[in-house]
């Protein structure tokens, strides 16, 4: 330890000596080039004069005003290089360069002062002042360099460098792929890359708070690319007609991807003119009573979201069973002539004294309705009325002439991926009426899912925007089985807590854990934590610095830490996404995780939108004189359905009364 201290003291003496010689050279420069003024001040040192004359004669030291200055600065630099000062966090390269620049200008660029037309004493004073000030500035800059903290840990306070990583830069295209161009940050610069969804059949989730760019950056691109590649498509358009307009116009402009050009269909309850008609409980697509039960189950849980958490409860199952029985009754009555959703609602709203004799007169429904009959026969009228009211009250909210119009006839079937008749179907909701329309549209969802998830059909896509606004029965099963049937599912919603609230904890977990492709814009809370855990950890550098008077000690270690921490996900800007994709056996993607900006050509999109055509009028309600009769025709359809149900009930009661084996049912009133 003593030897080390001696060495340090010796080094300090050498540095001091070099600095002293440097200062002497500066003084010599002033003495030589301002000699006239010095003599005027009465300074006459003959020995110094002779020494300087010898230096100049032998070495040419004073042939130029710069020589002594250059030697002085060289010795000053050596003295600063060997000096170890106390490190300071406030010393920056900016301060150092400022001091050095000022010193250089004052020290080297002041020769013109000697030629100023001023008194000799003034010129000498000014020259000496600039040389001295410049030297001090150079000295300060040199000393600050020795005190500079070379590892400033505060340069990356958000740990961006550790949490940036190389991402996929290849474009991997295939018959089914979706490809999104990106920009990502890695090693202090922005790079171009690609998100390659090479297997869309393993389902995709698009998350993000409102305004994070879900639809703009991801969902819209999926719709366009899948239409270009010949997918049949079902689009749930929560804010009709945003997505529907894109799908309609892109199909008009890119029909070349299809062997058989698909037809474009729209379900829109707000405007019957721009809506096709479709019966979601068409008898041809119901094979047994379980299909009727699924339809009743879907409609009831969409009307009563709280029932999702209470499945199996008595007052949840009772109205579902009753409504399923009515649907199946309409299926078997006159070969399903009146099997529509509006007819089922109207039938339910008849007196229960009329409903039960009619339903139980059919052997297929007798056992199905035995709990209701037991309550009726047992005198539990209040319980029975409560069960019926549990079905009537929510369904009565759906009594609407426009809704009856759309759902009471069929202009197309829901097998959208039929190779012989492919379809692009867009169903539109309205945020102001989402509870009512969402229930009806949920019925279309459940029927479509069952019809498209079959072997040998055309590749198809199911795109659901704002998933929590409808209850999508069978969603978990669709995700799990759709891959083998070439059904690409894309679900958009805001965060996982919405899914848990509206689908229940178990079903929400199945959805979250079975999707293969996930995109997330800004999300917070538990959703951000869940995603961060899904993306995993990476080995990151950790550096610590200890500063004392004599030295700086640095330690570097590594530890596993979150690749994309929740705080990063919570602070994503609009258009920035994190996520992961799945790959195939023959299309390997080494880096599946991404943290990037999805690049959207805004100018191109604006040009496309300007050229978009509105969805045309589908049904013309004009009469022979050109007058718009939409309201009259829609109301006439509404009255017709009510009258048909009244007539059905009257005819059925008459049939039962005339049948010796059944008329006892009427006596139970």
PLM regions with names:
Residues 150, 195-487, 503, 567-588, ...:
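P-loop NTPase motor domains
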Residues 592-596:
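N-terminal charged/capping segments associated with class I S-adenosyl-L-methionine
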Residues 77-79, 442, 446, 517, ...:
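Hydrophobic alpha-helical segments involved in membrane association or supramolecular assembly
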Residues 479-481, 485-488, 492-582:
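Conserved ATP-driven motor cores of ASCE-family P-loop NTPases powering translocation/secretion/packaging/pilus
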Residues 1-212, 216, 221, 547-549, ...:
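Basic- and hydrophobic-enriched, low-structure N-terminal and domain-boundary segments
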Residues 171-190, 369-382, 517, 523-524:
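N-terminal short leaders/motifs
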């Amino acid at each position: 330890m003593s030897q080390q201290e001696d060495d340090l003291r010796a080094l300090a003496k050498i540095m001091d000596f070099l600095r002293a010689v440097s200062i002497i050279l500066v003084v010599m420069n002033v003495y030589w080039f301002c000699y006239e003024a010095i003599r005027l001040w009465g300074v006459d040192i003959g020995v110094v004069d002779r020494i300087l004359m010898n230096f100049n004669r032998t070495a040419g030291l004073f042939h130029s005003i710069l020589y002594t200055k250059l030697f002085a600065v060289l010795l000053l630099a050596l003295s600063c290089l060997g000096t170890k000062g106390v490190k300071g966090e406030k010393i920056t390269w900016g301060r150092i360069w400022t001091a050095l620049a000022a010193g250089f200008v004052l020290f080297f660029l002041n020769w013109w002062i000697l030629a100023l037309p001023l008194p000799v004493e003034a010129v000498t004073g000014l020259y000496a002042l600039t040389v001295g000030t410049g030297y001090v500035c150079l000295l300060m800059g040199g000393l600050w360099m020795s005190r500079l903290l070379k590892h400033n840990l505060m340069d990356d306070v958000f740990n961006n460098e550790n949490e940036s990583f190389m991402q996929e830069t290849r474009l991997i295209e295939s018959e089914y792929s979706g490809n999104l161009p990106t920009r990502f940050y890695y090693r202090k610069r922005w790079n171009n890359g690609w998100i390659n969804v090479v297997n869309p059949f393993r389902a995709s989730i698009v998350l993000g708070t409102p305004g994070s760019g879900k639809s703009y950056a991801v969902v819209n691109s999926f719709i366009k690319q899948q239409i270009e590649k010949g997918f049949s498509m079902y689009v749930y358009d929560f804010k009709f007609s945003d997505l529907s307009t894109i799908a309609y116009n892109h199909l008009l402009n890119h029909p070349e991807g299809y062997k058989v050009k698909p037809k474009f269909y729209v379900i829109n309850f707000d405007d019957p003119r721009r809506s096709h008609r479709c019966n979601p409980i068409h008898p041809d697509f119901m094979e047994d009573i379980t299909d009727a039960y699924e339809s009743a189950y879907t409609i009831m849980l969409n009307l009563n979201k709280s029932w999702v958490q209470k499945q199996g409860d008595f007052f949840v199952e009772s109205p579902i069973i009753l409504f399923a029985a009515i649907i199946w009754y309409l299926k078997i009555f006159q070969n399903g002539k009146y099997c529509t959703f509006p007819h089922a609602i109207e039938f339910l709203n008849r007196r229960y004294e009329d409903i039960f004799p009619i339903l139980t007169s059919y052997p297929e429904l007798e056992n199905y309705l035995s709990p209701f009959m037991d309550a009726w026969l047992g005198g539990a009228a209040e319980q029975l009325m409560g069960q019926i009211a549990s079905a009537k009250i929510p369904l009565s909210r759906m009594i609407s002439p426009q809704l009856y119009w759309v759902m009471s006839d069929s202009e197309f079937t829901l097998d959208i991926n039929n190779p012989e008749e492919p379809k692009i179907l867009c169903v539109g909701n309205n945020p102001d009426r989402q509870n009512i329309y969402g229930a009806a549209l949920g019925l279309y969802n459940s029927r479509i899912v069952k019809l498209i998830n079959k072997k040998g059909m055309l590749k198809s896509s199911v795109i659901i925007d704002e998933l929590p606004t409808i209850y999508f029965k069978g969603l978990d099963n669709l995700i799990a089985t759709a891959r083998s049937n070439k059904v690409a599912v894309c679900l958009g919603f805001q965060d996982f807590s919405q899914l848990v609230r509206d689908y229940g904890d178990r079903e929400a977990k199945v959805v979250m854990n079975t999707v293969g492709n996930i995109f997330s814009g800004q999300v917070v809370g538990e959703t951000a934590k869940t995603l961060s855990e899904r993306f995993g950890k990476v080995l990151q550098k950790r550096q610590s610095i200890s500063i004392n008077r004599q030295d700086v000690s640095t330690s570097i270690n590594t530890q596993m830490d979150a690749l994309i921490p929740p705080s990063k996900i919570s602070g994503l800007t609009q258009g920035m996404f994190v996520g992961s994709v799945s790959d195939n056996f023959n299309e390997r993607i080494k880096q599946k995780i991404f943290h990037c900006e999805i690049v959207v050509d805004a100018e191109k999109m604006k040009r496309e939108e300007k050229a978009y055509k509105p969805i045309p009028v589908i049904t013309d309600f004009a009469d022979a004189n050109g007058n718009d009769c939409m309201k009259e025709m829609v109301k006439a359809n509404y009255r017709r359905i009510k009258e048909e149900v009244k007539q059905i009930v009257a005819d059925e009661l008459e049939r039962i009364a005339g049948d010796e084996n059944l008329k006892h049912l009427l006596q139970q009133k």
